[in-house]
Every structure is written in structure tokens, then in C-alpha cells.
């Protein structure tokens, strides 16, 4: 969107614009949606989520039903739940935990990696096999999922959990910042 070649380009032909693969900051989404609007697009960016273990995408923002910060709702026949990290205990709506996915596209396991398979695929009390994604998230009472970040990316400092993506969102909101990356330093 910063490239001069995009000045004056008519994007009214667009039918969809999608984002996945990592979190999209609220500020960047706002900037990109404004860019689309200013270039005659009738669409906004729709966020999605998925993992290799469930054959890519498994969640997407419904058309004209975006909720700020959400990656959308699970696809039909795909189930999401949030569990307390390191357990299979389901968290209540609005509580942060590990994103777990179950459904017909979930893998059978990693080839010749039984230990990794056992850590990732777990049978819960409901009898279903769930992919433990290693991602932190929240689900609201309407089934919208909010990706926070990879569990391994969390920084623990002075006994506090610090989420780099939250700090990056704040920094990225500044007009003079194009993009930021927060890392922990021992």
C-alpha cells in the first residue's frame, strides 16, 4: 500500500481480500481497509486462521460480520475450543488459553513422529480428537475466535507474561512507525 505504483489504482474488481499466517494488527487492518476503500474496493480484509495439522484454513471472518481483532468463526463441521494451557480443561468464553481444533480435516498424525503426534493430538473427555495448536486465543459467546500469539512467543519477565503482539499493536499505531517487532532480551 506504500508503493507509488498503487496510487490511483482502481480496486473495484476485488471480490475478496484475505489475511492469514500470522496475526494482523488492528492498526494495520484499519490502514489496509482504508486503502481498499480509497481505491474503490467494496470489500474489506477478512482474517482467517488454520494450521498444517488441519489442512490449512479452518476459521474465517464471515462476510459483513467482522469483529475487531477476531480471526472469525470456525468452518462448518469444524470445532474450536479454548483450553487451559497444558491441559484439556475447557476455558469459559472470554478466557484466554490454547486454541484447539477438531473436525474432519484434522490430520491422523505426524509421519514417524509418535511423540510429537501424542503432544499435538489429544482425545478430550468428549471423545473427540483435538489438535493442540500451541497458539493462545480467546473465544466469545458468539463463536468468534481471537488469536493472541504463539505460546512459545510469550515473554516472561519479572513474573509477568508479556505478549509482544500487544506491544507491537501499540507501537504500530504511531504514524511514524511502518512496522515493529518486539523481542525479549535476557
Which residues make up each language-model segment?
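Gly/Ser/Thr-rich phosphate-binding loop
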Residues: 2-70, 79
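Short Gly/Pro-enriched turn/cap motifs at secondary-structure boundaries
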Residues: 69-75, 120-121, 127-129
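Active-site glycine-centered loops adjacent to acidic/histidine catalytic or metal-binding residues
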Residues: 21, 50, 72, 103, ...
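AMP-binding/adenylate-forming catalytic core of the ANL superfamily
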Residues: 103, 108-109, 119, 128, ...
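Conserved beta-loop-beta connector loops within the AMP-binding
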Residues: 44, 81-101, 123, 139-142
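Acidic-histidine catalytic/liganding microenvironments
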Residues: 3, 114, 174-175
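Active-site glycine/GP-rich loop and adjacent strand/helix microenvironment
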Residues: 59-62, 72, 91-95, 108-112
